[in-house]
């Protein structure tokens, strides 16, 4: 008998219990931890000489098995119209270098299907980045939804593949790749418009930008001048040389007379500047 379901969401097609089960599979603390440790979702992956090729599935193996079992059980009893599909609207990778710009090397990043033994780029979506091009943002858009199935001993799903080339003499980390995506799961699938892989070069962060503003420069110079003035003319509690007075008298500098009995005259006597030998 043919399936006679209607076009409804997964939550509406299944009961509340099974919907809750799916939520637990996707968003349990264990599933979230697996997404970080196995897939590097939102984490920085370091490209080193001892890991020149990195293949990161977009769904952890354990989570994949549980989701596939959930859809299969619903399909077997006629509650769902398929055994489940994985949909990823977009994968965004932020790539930064961790060596100087004169290092000769490059990265090749693409999206692959683990159901393909050759791990070829999906629809030719592949980006090559030379070291001096970094930093950069790279985006991929799959053109189909991936069936939740097992091919041989491989759990079929999309994966981000990163290859490191060159960097002779650099055995440590030469680049950091942080990937983000949002996987969706449904009992229905679709095909999508083919969009070429996107590559956007990003200007490096200018951490001295604030110091180039006139106001910032003025504040910096003023603070430096104040420091110089303080270091030369501020005295400690040390006693003043008695010869300072005689030298000040020899300078013979006249100041405008102040009115007798005025407050300014008393202040000038109280705050009379002191001259120190050698200054």
Curated annotation (Swiss-Prot):
It is found in: Host cell junction, Host plasmodesma. Pfam families: 3A. Residues 254-268 have a biased composition (Low complexity). Its main location: host cell. Disulfide bonds: none annotated. It comes from the Viruses. Keywords: Host cell junction, Transport, Viral movement protein. InterPro entries: MPV. GO terms for biological process: transport of virus in host, cell to cell. Residues 246-279 are annotated as: Disordered. The keyword Disulfide bond does not apply. One of its GO terms (cellular component) is host cell plasmodesma. Transports viral genome to neighboring plant cells directly through plasmosdesmata, without any budding. The movement protein allows efficient cell to cell propagation, by bypassing the host cell wall barrier. Acts by forming a tubular structure at the host plasmodesmata, enlarging it enough to allow free passage of virion capsids. Belongs to the cucumovirus movement protein family. This is Movement protein. It comes from Cucumber mosaic virus (strain O).
């Amino acid at each position: 008998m043919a399936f006679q379901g209607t076009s409804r969401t997964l939550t509406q097609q299944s009961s509340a219990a099974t919907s809750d089960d799916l939520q637990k599979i996707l968003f349990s603390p264990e599933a979230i931890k697996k997404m970080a440790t196995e897939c590097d979702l939102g984490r920085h992956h370091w490209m080193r000489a001892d890991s020149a090729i990195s293949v990161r599935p977009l769904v952890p193996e354990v989570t994949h098995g549980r989701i596939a079992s959930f859809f299969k059980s619903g399909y077997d009893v006629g509650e769902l119209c398929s055994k489940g599909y994985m949909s990823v609207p977009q994968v965004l990778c932020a790539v930064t270098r961790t060596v100087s710009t004169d290092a000769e090397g490059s990265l090749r990043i693409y999206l692959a299907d683990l159901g393909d033994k050759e791990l070829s780029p999906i629809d030719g979506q592949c980006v090559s980045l030379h070291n001096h091009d970094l930093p950069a943002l790279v985006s991929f858009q799959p053109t189909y939804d991936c069936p939740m199935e097992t091919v041989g001993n491989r759990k079929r799903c999309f994966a981000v593949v990163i290859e490191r080339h060159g960097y002779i003499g650099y055995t440590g980390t030469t680049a950091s790749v942080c990937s983000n995506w949002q996987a969706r799961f449904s009992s229905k699938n679709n095909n999508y418009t083919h969009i070429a892989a996107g590559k956007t070069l990003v200007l490096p962060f200018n951490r001295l930008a604030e110091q180039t503003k006139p106001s910032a420069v003025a504040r910096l110079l003023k603070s430096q001048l104040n420091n110089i003035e303080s270091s030369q003319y501020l005295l400690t509690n040390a006693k003043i040389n008695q010869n300072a007075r005689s030298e000040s008298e020899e300078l013979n500098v006249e100041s405008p007379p102040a009115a007798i009995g005025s407050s300014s005259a008393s202040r000038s006597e109280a705050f009379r500047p002191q001259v120190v030998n050698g200054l």
